[in-house]
From Swiss-Prot:
<feature type="region of interest" description="Disordered">
    <location>
        <begin position="201"/>
        <end position="232"/>
    </location>
</feature>
<dbReference type="InterPro" id="IPR036598">
    <property type="entry name" value="GOLD_dom_sf"/>
</dbReference>
<dbReference type="InterPro" id="IPR051064">
    <property type="entry name" value="SEC14/CRAL-TRIO_domain"/>
</dbReference>
<dbReference type="InterPro" id="IPR009038">
    <property type="entry name" value="GOLD_dom"/>
</dbReference>
<feature type="compositionally biased region" description="Polar residues">
    <location>
        <begin position="201"/>
        <end position="211"/>
    </location>
</feature>
<dbReference type="InterPro" id="IPR011074">
    <property type="entry name" value="CRAL/TRIO_N_dom"/>
</dbReference>
<dbReference type="InterPro" id="IPR036865">
    <property type="entry name" value="CRAL-TRIO_dom_sf"/>
</dbReference>
<feature type="domain" description="CRAL-TRIO">
    <location>
        <begin position="315"/>
        <end position="491"/>
    </location>
</feature>
<dbReference type="InterPro" id="IPR036273">
    <property type="entry name" value="CRAL/TRIO_N_dom_sf"/>
</dbReference>
<feature type="compositionally biased region" description="Polar residues">
    <location>
        <begin position="686"/>
        <end position="695"/>
    </location>
</feature>
<dbReference type="InterPro" id="IPR001251">
    <property type="entry name" value="CRAL-TRIO_dom"/>
</dbReference>
<dbReference type="Pfam" id="PF00650">
    <property type="entry name" value="CRAL_TRIO"/>
</dbReference>
<feature type="domain" description="GOLD">
    <location>
        <begin position="518"/>
        <end position="667"/>
    </location>
</feature>
<dbReference type="Pfam" id="PF04707">
    <property type="entry name" value="PRELI"/>
</dbReference>
<dbReference type="Pfam" id="PF03765">
    <property type="entry name" value="CRAL_TRIO_N"/>
</dbReference>
<dbReference type="InterPro" id="IPR006797">
    <property type="entry name" value="PRELI/MSF1_dom"/>
</dbReference>
<feature type="domain" description="PRELI/MSF1">
    <location>
        <begin position="3"/>
        <end position="175"/>
    </location>
</feature>
Length: 707
């Protein structure tokens, strides 16, 4: 398997020429990088105008590998070929490197670039990508891969420190600004040489005077740019550290790769970085597992309109009076603090009075509010806060709370929260746990993720008041009064729900299962091999607009739009509707006896849609009549004589016989439609989760006129 690395954008608040002078101090040897033993120049070229300088070097590295492995391989050192291309005119440096040793067995490719910051020409940006592909290595492929990745990630951080070291060395020598390239400079021109020879000192003095005080003052200058939320599709390292926390190089790379994939497949609208990071953490930064989990969650949010819950959900009066939970300041780490007096909650009464769905909606609104508070606290405290603390008081917990339907509802709610709000719980403090608690814990703990269970701290009796108690995590000033503190906690006291508020038997039966929003506009369907799913759309007026919005939940499909001269037989669909199977049934409308181009025609070019993609589009009809939306399984051989690697892997995994999708379509009358066709947006939005990117390299929105 090919291992890939993508760095965030690292910003130096120094001009490009000064950063280049620091970079070139690494050659031919660099004591600050022990594994780098030296380099020899193989080729060198300078353009006549001095704008371009190309150097190709052979670099000698001492890889920290077991001596036995080195002996088997028969090498003591590893050699790389590095080609550096400096363009002084454009102020860019491109570094291309690949391994020379064992190039037939191991392929290592690295590309780095230095360039001027797009918003400040006195700053310099650095980016880095690399790939590792081990074809064979004497049966030690896995070992070599681990060693190589360990060495590489260790040197990433070291490389930044080396640049900072040499920048500080230059500043200590009084070199804080170097001249830029200008037409007419002597052949072999170099900024540092020009500075030292005094060729352009007068120009530099004029430039410094026009720019005001020097930005590179050693006493007050920082090597890192002030972090800001990125306005482009690229993440900056300082932004990650400021808003997302300390990540290892490979964790940063996983975040960037998953974010790029979402940008390409979700039409420029993607979850916020902190939410993507939560799913990566939940899957130990395994990008494929995190991608699958995140896509399922995004589809769930869209289908049940969870993004709008804070705007639309109003807790019933019963919850406001008898649900003993609420937000209460923050803990010592700045995390939002939620307090739940579970022992005072009449779980049976709430379920009987409201049903499971209302309780689930309330729990979801709490989680959405928690994410919002984390963002606010991040800005308030100046450090990344992406989880909250929950303090659960079990005083009053008894066998009444082990009511079987209530426990079942709790377990289902836990499953929903674990799947869609991973890594949001920073710490769970359980206080005054009674003797009955182990019984409840035995029932609940198997449904809680192992990472979440490790964050639980359980106190029985009054142990929470002693050393190691809640005072270690919550300031004494905000410890609730019912736990012996001085702070008044404004949450309901709970208590028994009056039976007069219970639902009738009919209402209780309707609330027997968690359904969330039954009025969801999305439908689900499966696509089988040889059995596409098709929808008939009847258009009464020409120039009407057919819009669609669908998500591919499993497998790859081909989406097409047809205009039919014949009316399809809809009896199969009517039978499915009568059987109540419409949401997930597969309906085929185009008769096998029909001929494409005679009985029906294609008006929308086939679009291959990959698993996890979110597709939105539109079509302006030229004629009234019957239109058919079709989703059929994508064959790896379609349109190509060579099968894609992804398709082969999918078939080997046994998932190639069934696809699943979630879709919505609508017809807009021509007089009701306003705006550009390509501006049609999905019917869902990530009101709490999303950030909109400026560009998307792959847009699935279309606006075609029938021909």
């Amino acid at each position: 398997m090919v291992q890939k690395y993508q760095s965030p954008v690292r910003v130096y608040k120094y001009p490009f020429e000064l950063v280049m002078a620091a970079y070139e101090k690494r050659f031919p040897t660099c004591p600050q990088i022990p594994v780098f033993l030296g380099s020899d120049i193989l080729q060198e070229h300078k353009s006549e105008d001095g704008a371009l300088h190309v150097v190709e070097r052979s670099c000698k590295l001492n890889v920290d590998a077991p001596r036995l492995l080195k002996k088997i391989a028969g090498v003591e050192f590893v050699y790389f070929i590095q080609k550096n291309t400096v363009n002084w005119k454009d102020r860019t440096l491109l570094i291309e490197a690949h391994n020379e040793t064992f190039s037939s067995r191991v392929l290592v490719n690295e590309t780095c670039s230095y360039s001027v910051h797009p918003e400040n020409e006195e700053w310099t940006c650095f980016e880095q990508t690399a790939s590792l592909d081990i074809k064979s290595f004497f049966g030690f492929e896995s070992t070599v891969e681990k060693i190589a990745m360990k060495q590489y990630t260790a040197n990433i951080k070291r490389g930044k420190e080396v640049i900072e070291f040499y920048l500080n060395e230059l500043i200590s020598q009084g070199i804080t600004h170097l001249p830029k390239w200008t037409p007419g400079v002597p052949a072999g021109w170099h900024p540092l040489q020009a500075f030292r020879s005094g060729i352009t000192r007068s120009n530099q003095a004029e430039q410094t005077a026009s720019q005001g005080p020097c930005k590179a003052d050693a006493g007050s200058h920082s090597l890192a740019a002030e972090p800001s939320t990125p306005d482009t599709d690229k993440l900056e390292a300082d932004y990650i550290e400021r808003y997302l926390g300390q990540l290892t190089p490979m964790q940063e790379s996983a975040l960037i790769h998953l974010r790029q994939w979402l940008q390409e497949t979700h039409k420029g609208k993607i979850p916020k970085d902190e939410h993507i990071l939560r799913f990566l953490r939940a899957r130990d930064f395994n990008m494929e597992k995190a991608r699958e989990m995140l896509c399922q969650s995004l589809s769930w949010r869209k289908q049940h309109q969870v993004d709008y819950i804070l705007q639309t959900w109003q807790p019933p009066r019963v919850l406001e009076e008898y649900y003993a939970g609420g937000w209460h300041y923050h803990d010592k780490d700045g995390r939002p603090l939620y307090i739940l007096r579970l022992g005072q909650v009449d779980t049976k009464g709430l379920v009987k009075a409201l049903g499971e769905e209302a309780i689930l909606r309330h729990v979801l609104s709490i989680n959405e509010e928690g994410q919002k508070r984390c963002e606010e606290n991040t800005r308030q405290f100046g450090r990344p806060i992406w989880s909250w603390t929950c303090l659960v008081d079990l005083e009053g917990l008894n066998m009444r709370h082990l009511w079987r339907p209530g426990v079942k509802a709790l377990l289902r709610i836990i499953e929903v929260v674990e799947a869609n709000y991973p890594e949001t719980l920073g710490r769970l403090l359980i206080v005054r746990a009674p003797r009955v608690f182990p019984v409840l814990w035995t029932l609940v703990s198997p449904f809680i993720n192992e990472n979440s269970r490790q964050k639980f701290l359980i106190y029985s009796g009054n142990n929470y008041q002693g050393p190691g108690g809640i005072a270690d995590y919550v300031d004494k000033e905000i410890v609730p009064d019912f736990l012996g503190g001085e702070c008044v906690c404004n949450i309901p006291e709970g208590g028994l729900v009056p039976k007069s508020l219970y639902q009738s038997d009919e209402d209780a039966e309707m609330s027997d299962h968690i359904r969330l929003w039954t009025e969801t506009i999305y439908q689900s369907s499966c696509v089988w091999k040889g059995a596409p799913h098709e929808i008939i759309v009847e258009i009464l007026e020409e120039e009407s607009v057919i819009t669609w919005d669908f998500d591919i939940l499993r497998g790859d499909v081909i989406f097409s739009l047809f205009h039919s001269k014949r009316a399809p037989d809809t009896r199969q669909r009517e039978l499915a509707l009568a059987a109540g199977n419409a949401p997930s049934s597969n309906v085929q409308l185009i008769d096998k006896s029909w001929t494409l181009g005679v009985d029906y025609s294609r008006v929308q070019a086939p679009l291959v849609c990959r698993e996890g993609e979110s597709i939105q589009g539109s079509h302006v009809t030229r004629w009234p009549g019957i239109y058919i939306l079709q989703w059929k399984m994508h064959s790896s051989a379609s349109g190509s004589s060579m099968a894609r690697v992804d398709d082969v892997l999918a078939s080997l995994q046994g998932s190639s016989h069934k696809c699943k999708l979630m879709y919505y379509f609508e017809v807009l009358a021509s007089e009701d439609f306003r705006g550009s066709m390509s501006s049609l947006e999905s019917c869902s939005g990530f009101s709490q989760l999303s950030g909109v990117t400026n560009t998307s390299s792959k847009s699935h929105s279309s606006s075609l006129i029938s021909r």
